[in-house]
Amino acid sequence: MFPFVLIAQNKFDVYKVSYDQYENEKKINRSTEIFFQNQIVFLTKNSDKMQQYIDLKNNVNISTIAFEDKIFKKIIPFDSLPSSKKEDDTRVILGYNCEHVSFSYFSNRIDIWYTEKAIAKGTPNSNYLPNKNALVLKMVYNGNQTLVANAITKVKNYQPFVNYNDGAIVVDKSEFEEIIINSRYKKLAIFDNEIINFDPNRTIPKENELVTDKVYHFSNGSVVLKKIKITPELKNSQAIFAKLTCKSNGDAYDRTGSVFIAPTKKKDDITTLLDAYLYGLDRLPIYIDNKENKYQGIIKEEGYSPAIEILSFFTPFGVNYFNNKRKINNYNWAKEVIYKEEVSSLIPTDEDEVWIGIFIGNYDAGGHIVSLELDAYPSMDKKEGEVDRKKYIAPLFSTVNTMEMSEQNYGGLFANDTLKVNFEIKEDIQNLQLLYTTTGHGGWDNGDEFVPRMNKIFVDGEEVFKIIPWRTDCATYRLSNPASGNFYDGLSSSDLSRSNWCPGTLTPPYSIPLSKLQKGKHVIEVVIEQGPNEGSSTNHWNISGVLVGQLNNLNLK
């Protein structure tokens, strides 16, 4: 880090200009100050991450920021700033007869009143300086936000400084803007260009050899898993987003994908999804439907919880790998697909470590290339002494068969049965809701992928939610689907409407409020009007349900 460079105090006087702030002509409890010394205007506090200066000697604005142990500097010449328009009126402020000019910037109007007679020079906003001899005494944004100078004083106890020297890295305006944004939050890389493919020769690691921050491949290569630490940035975040990048490494088809979390084992008698990845499907409890079909690990039971699905996504038809194999004039294929969704309520930040995984169902040797990061955004409005309530996260069911390549059954029970889960709440929960994700599958004309089907949810026998999940916007994502088939009517397969998903998109959950649910034992039921199978072609539904909320003491049985 470059050391701060202090400006000498014994040669040049320092002047402070103080401004009151108003909103809609009402004074608010906030003020602004700028400092002027030796033709330099200091616009920021010494403690601010980004520093801003107006250099009147060299006719430039300078902004600096410390990021990743480096100092970056942006230099903006005065002649590239917004130009002003002279207005007719004048007014007296602090005894100075002030001229009026206006600026137009990004569809905003900024009115400025300034004097050239004051010893101090400058403006509280470096974009709006009428000339280098001006001191702005009043600034009005769009007629309703106002800064008005209330005093100009000489100060003796202020030490202006600049936090750069010749070693600072000069970047352009767009690069500096990127650095500012990146400095405001923390990116936690989870997976980096990992291949998810079908590889039956993958060796399953031994449980006693598993370590934190190492990537493991399971279920014949179709799942990547990693145990990560819940960092202070995650624990203290205001919002957490999962950002997934995906591109084809040889697979041409749209595939089911899921990003999910599984707990680390705390007790020997607790079964987790990791047990099945390590030792096989027999480790998972079995759900048996009315026709004796067996489904492995799909509901919460004593000693077992299904995974917490944080992203439900679908790969596009062959983006990246097939771009040059399916060239069409005026079709500029995407290089990759980026999925990003807020997952704050689903990340167990009161844990020290969790397993996080990505599943893509495919039998292709090339498969797909994925990267995943968690973006943690710090809290801006947290009051001093305020304590965060603990998150309540209780996964109830998931028919997403992340071990499809290990012969885990598809979620096709809804044709002849209702999915029923018993659970118990032992605490008072604030803002309790069920996050319900649902997508229908069966890829022929009469299959549930292409036929709207009713979904209903009942809690303790009372209907709390119903919807026909359906997406009609799939044509929006045509340029992410180079390998999609083109039909004689001009449509592409990726254009077709589907049961709540499109090739190359996320399927966000529905938020179902359950605030009336009290402590005690309950039962939740999911009813889907699943259509009949045709020969070997089967319908199924990928659904997941997680209870979320806030509480002081988590104790769910």
Predicted regions and their residues:
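Extended soluble regions of mature proteins
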Residues: N10-Y185
